[in-house]
Amino acid sequence: SAKREIANAFLVTDDDIIISDPEAEYSPLVERLGGQVIRVSPTSTQYINPMDINMNYSEEDNPIALKADFILSLCELVVGGKEGLQPIEKTVIDRCVHQVYQSYFNDPRPDNMPVLEDLYDELMKQDEKEAHHVATALEIYVKGSLNLFNHRTNVDIDNRLVCYDIKELGKQLKKIGMLIVQDQVWGRVTANREEGKSTRYYMDEMHLLLREDQTAAYSVEIWKRFRKWGGIP
């Protein structure tokens, strides 16, 4: 079973192990092994920041371009509806993502790490009505009752064994949570690659991320990179 495989990998290898856990079934094992369980829910005070980025985020010289792809996928889940994002919406999101990270990379300290609200504010400054449409759709995730992803990361995501318990996320939030966890895993893979370390990722219900075009394309691309960079799915 997956639990036995995880326990063996933990005891026999030095690999980092990350679990996306939609049914809260891995928490007892992870706690027994001294790992970190992160409960992602609208009522939790444990936060992961979807805007987290590190200098090694992409193998090309431009980590912002790959991060923009992730943010576009996130916005597709939030804004897209059946039609997905429209071309002008994609353009303004991409522009704003570049502006937000440009100012971060000018002074890349942890307390300058952008949050969703920085993207929201940047969208509101744009002239296009499409930018305001996207910002309005994001508002509930920034200032409203679903603002759990509008905080800086405040948990130990560097533990060798991390389990993201997303059971309490509702149907719509679950996909968003899975996408954000996938991005956190990618951040870990890129950091570990620098140290020559492998990263194992266990993920249930992957099919949920393959239903929207942009999100599916992004997820497939990330999984290809993941394997190339020493990830073990």
Predicted regions mapped to residue ranges:
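Glycine-rich phosphate-binding loop of nucleotide-binding enzymes
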Residues: 1-42
